Amino acid sequence: MSPKISLKAARVNAGLTLLNASAHLKIGKDLLLKWEKNPGLVNPIWQKKISAVYNLPVDFIFFGQ
């Protein structure tokens, strides 16, 4: 199993602020912050959307599994 980076680290590495990322994902910043604090809450559909916005494969981001 390869090492994974946190959801927040993935966002920062993509050069996005919390507000920028939430705008790209069309969700509220509070929801994104909640997911960053508890990535196990992110369902597979949103995992794919986040990985596309952050330009990282889903397998590289830690989603709590």
Q: What does each model-found stretch correspond to?
A:
Residues 5-24, 49:
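Short basic helix-loop element that most often maps to the first helix and adjoining turn
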Residues 64:
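Conserved short acidic donor-positioning loop in nucleotide-sugar-dependent glycosyltransferases
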Residues 26, 45-60:
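DNA major-groove recognition helix of helix-turn-helix/homeodomain DNA-binding modules
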Residues 26-42:
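Recognition helix of helix-turn-helix/homeodomain-like DNA-binding domains
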Residues 1-2:
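A detector for short, charged/polar N-terminal pre-domain segments
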Residues 7, 21-22, 32-35, 61:
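Conserved hydrophobic/aromatic packing and binding residues within compact polymer-binding modules
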